[in-house]
């Protein structure tokens, strides 16, 4: 068993369409003090292409409901480099994200993972990958828009209002232990990394039957050092961009 009394950050990961008024009322009895939701984009056509269940209006209303439920630390995820992305569309996404006035914004470039529907669409030439010049332009716009809006660029993909950096993100790169609960969640105890199975049904059944519901990876000194150096390099690149 784990005591949660001293946890300064307990984050719930959710999809916008999950955050109904009733669901948030149920959460009020639990010790979550931060909500992170995967909005990805405010372009409804692209959300449909990505097979997301929510639309732009659902995402905006989810943030509003979280505020009404009393949450003062909200994070949203965005993705850029999406199929058909243009400078104008990305700027519109950034303006809408800023208008929500959330405490934290993470933005990641789209990665085409093998054996996913969108990867298959790319290989079948149904969609096109954005070029490197456009990707760089989108990243530059991301930094310019969010810093101008008062967000601190504290990690390569993460921006926050002053005092609202993600403790999990910074702990991850510093090698500090963390606990992840639920399907697909990751944990680290200082020497091993664990990740729970992704199937909700198998996860629940495994817990009920006392079965192992996670995989384990031992991180030797070399692996931990390489990850530390990777983060140092990322920080150097970020500092260089800020200077430029």
What is the predicted function of each stretch?
Residues 1-235, 239:
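C-terminal scaffold of the Radical SAM
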